Swiss-Prot record:
Name of protein: Flotillin-like protein FloA
Signal peptide: none
InterPro entries linked: FloA (IPR022853)
Taxonomic path: Bacteria, Pseudomonadati, Verrucomicrobiota, Opitutia, Opitutales
Subunit structure: Homooligomerizes.
Organism: Opitutus terrae (strain DSM 11246 / JCM 15787 / PB90-1)
Cited function: Found in functional membrane microdomains (FMM) that may be equivalent to eukaryotic membrane rafts. FMMs are highly dynamic and increase in number as cells age. Flotillins are thought to be important factors in membrane fluidity.
Cellular compartments annotated: Cell membrane; Membrane raft
Length: 334
């Protein structure tokens, strides 16, 4: 009796599970049929076995069908298995169709997979293509608030720009993103300011910057099409030219001081060398003077010098010393 009761309980539980599954499949199948997007029950069972949320797949197909877009359940399931967001892809297709933008399922799936994990989505790409977005240049998140350029007269000009772009769906996959647009526009603005003869030219016609930059085709190879570049603010910065001249003058001054110090050191060294040479010459004079008495003694012995000659020489030396003392009286005062 107990085994029979257990058997009935098991059969009842299995029956309830089967009925629940049947009702689940039946409700989805019926919803698709009534919406004009019929799905085979075998496809529903197969998706269940593949752990695919068949209800989401059917809902996506119903939305596409109601919008007049023909999609098979296999195409939707393939995008899901590839890791895409099928609902977002369908919404993007519907938005593109309403805006009369050429976008097919394959391209929408490619954009969806390309933007996965980047914070973007295929819906945003289509939305930007329909409703252009404005990009601040430079990006405030970069820490810079202005794009700085220097005119030919050395005056710095600070510029804020706003770039209006529209998504180019044909180049969205593999195309350069917003960072590249900001970098290119910044480079163009700096180049345009640098080619101006004076900062006054930039202040008088800031629209010339946007026109010049816009004509350079900065959106080539990017995922966006630049519609306009507007100069939001122009300010005068520092006199960079004067600062550079001041720095150059300071550098020249330092170089001149170093060269003067080198020449002074060379002069001091030469002076010391001359002092040493004078001392050397004086030593030679003293040495020569010390040889005079010896030579006189030798002259006396050999008879080449007489006594009268000696006294005459002494008198001459005395007269010479007296004349020298008379010629330099200041030496006596000292």
């Amino acid at each position: 009796m107990n085994l029979y009761l257990i058997f009935l309980i098991v059969v009842g539980v299995v029956g309830l599970v089967l009925v629940g599954l049947f009702l689940s499949f039946f409700s989805v199948w019926l919803r698709a049929l009534l919406a004009g997007a019929p799905v085979s029950p075998f496809n529903l069972v197969a998706m269940r076995l593949r752990q695919v949320p068949y209800s989401v797949m059917v809902d996506a197909r119903i939305r596409a069908t109601k919008a007049g877009i023909k999609l098979s359940i296999d195409e939707i399931e393939a995008q899901y298995l590839a890791g895409g967001n099928v609902i977002a892809c369908v919404h993007a297709l519907i938005a593109a169709q309403k805006a009369r933008i050429a976008l097919d399922w394959q391209r929408a799936c490619a954009i969806d997979l390309a933007t996965k994990g980047s914070g973007k989505s295929v819906e945003e790409a289509v939305r930007t293509s329909v409703d252009p977005k404005v990009i601040d240049c430079p990006n405030p998140e970069s820490g810079r608030t202005t794009i700085d350029g220097v005119a030919k007269d050395g005056i710095q000009v600070k510029v804020k720009a706003r770039v209006t772009v529209r998504t180019n769906l044909d180049r969205f996959v593999g195309g350069a993103k917003e960072e590249t647009i900001i970098a290119r526009v910044g480079e163009g603005i700096v180049s345009t300011i640098g080619s101006a003869e004076s900062y006054k030219v930039v202040l008088e016609s800031p629209d010339a910057i946007s026109k010049t930059v816009l004509h350079r085709g900065l959106d080539v190879g990017s995922a966006f099409e630049i519609l306009s570049i507007d100069i939001a603010d122009v300010d005068v910065g520092e006199n960079v030219g004067a600062k550079l001249q001041e720095a150059q003058a300071q550098a020249n001054k330092s170089i001149a001081q170093a060269q003067a110090e080198i020449r002074r050191a060379a002069a001091v060294a030469l002076e010391q060398e001359m002092v040493a040479r004078v001392q050397e010459m004086q030593a030679k004079v003293v040495e020569a003077q010390s040889q005079v008495p010896l030579a006189m003694a030798e002259a006396f012995r050999s008879g080449r010098l007489g006594v009268m000659d000696y006294f005459r020489m002494e008198n001459i030396q005395g007269d010479t010393a007296m004349r020298n003392s008379l010629a330099r009286p200041e030496d006596k005062k000292q």
